[in-house]
Design a protein with these regions (language model features):
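Short, charged beta-turn/beta-strand-edge "cap" motif at the junction between a beta-strand
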Residues: 54-58
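A basic, amphipathic helix-loop patch mediating RNA/tRNA/ribosome contacts
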Residues: 1-45
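Short, solvent-exposed secondary-structure boundary/capping segments
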Residues: 68-78
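Glycine-rich, charged/polar anion/phosphate-binding loops
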Residues: 48
C-alpha cells in the first residue's frame, strides 16, 4: 500500500504540520529514491526518503506506510 510523501513525513513526525511537509516538497527539499518529490508522490516500503529541513538532512528508509499522525514510539517503527 502506498501513501503520499507529504502525509508520510508529517505522520512520522519529521515535520510539525502537514502544510510544512507539503511546502518542503514543493521547495525541492524532499527526495524519494534520489528524485525530487512532489507532495502527492506515493511512497512504499523500501523507498529511501531524504528530507532537508533547518540545515539538516534526514535520510530514512520506509518500512511501513501510514497516513495518520501517531505517537512518537509508533512513528519510529515506520522507518529506519
Amino acid at each position: 500500500m502506498s501513501t503520499r510523501v507529504d502525509a508520510w513525513i508529517w505522520a512520522i513526525r519529521l515535520t510539525k504540520t502537514r502544510s510544512a511537509a507539503g511546502a518542503a516538497c514543493r521547495g525541492g527539499h524532499v527526495r524519494v529514491n534520489g528524485a525530487t518529490a512532489k507532495p502527492a508522490q506515493p511512497v512504499v516500503p523500501g523507498d529511501e526518503v531524504r528530507v532537508r529541513l533547518n540545515g539538516r538532512e534526514r535520510v530514512v528508509e520506509v518500512t511501513k506506510t501510514i497516513s495518520k499522525r501517531v505517537s512518537a514510539p509508533m512513528a519510529a517503527e515506520c522507518y529506519i
